[in-house]
Design a protein with these regions (language model features):
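Conserved "landmark" site that anchors the functional core of diverse proteins
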Residues: 1-3, 21-24, 42
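Gly-rich Lys/Arg/Thr-decorated short loops/hinges at beta-loop-alpha junctions or inter-strand turns
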Residues: 6-20, 142
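A general structural motif
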Residues: 3, 44-46, 171
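Hydrophobic alpha-helical positions that pack around
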Residues: 45-157, 163-168, 178-179
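Short alpha-helix boundary/capping segments
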Residues: 19-30, 152
């Protein structure tokens, strides 16, 4: 199997998460360089960045910045869970369906990476910086100041919750990973 394109998943994988959105608004140029590096690494000439259409500011900014990259296309996507699922994303962006397992994206010519990965590739290649931190969303009805935090991997959730203003005493449960698939 040969890759024909790189697809960047800029769809938040879970409702209420905003880390990818913030990353695009703050690091659009770096993400696009990362996509270019990924395209070169897998020897393809076409890249796509799929962004849900409820993020018009990110779509606008990424489209403006991508004008310098004729082989990278920003693809607005309808908001539909699980739009960020790899197979759903491939179908929405390039209209190809990944067959049942053991088939994988490369079987339909796609290499899929997350927007955070594109940024991490930029940092690794251009700045020689290893991956040791990422943006994390802390949100929910009980969180006093829902926020995104650039945090080192391994940071305890309790520290992030405190940074977001803490939780009331009667909070029943803290879920790590998102409301749909988290634990």
């Amino acid at each position: 199997c040969k890759a024909g394109c790189v697809i960047i998943n800029a769809v938040e994988c879970e409702p209420y998460l905003t880390a990818d959105h913030q990353l695009m608004l703050e690091k659009a140029d770096e993400i696009l360089v990362g996509v270019s590096i990924l395209m070169k690494a897998v020897n393809v000439t076409k890249g796509y960045i799929g962004i849900e259409n409820n993020k018009p500011d990110a779509i606008k900014l990424m489209t403006e910045k991508a004008a310098q990259y004729p082989n990278i296309e920003i693809v607005p996507l309808k908001v539909q869970y699980p739009q960020g699922g790899e197979k759903q994303l491939i179908d929405a962006v390039i209209r190809r369906q990944v067959p049942a397992p053991p088939a994988i994206p490369i079987n339909v010519g796609a290499v899929v990476q997350n927007v955070g990965t594109a940024y991490a590739v930029y940092e690794a290649v251009q700045k020689n910086k290893p991956l040791f931190e990422r943006i994390v969303t802390v949100t929910g009805k009980s969180v006093k100041n829902p926020s995104n935090f650039l945090t080192r991997m391994g940071t305890p959730m309790s520290q992030l919750i405190e940074a977001a203003g803490g939780l009331p005493e009667d909070t029943g449960k803290v879920i790590g990973g998102g409301p749909m698939m988290g634990k």
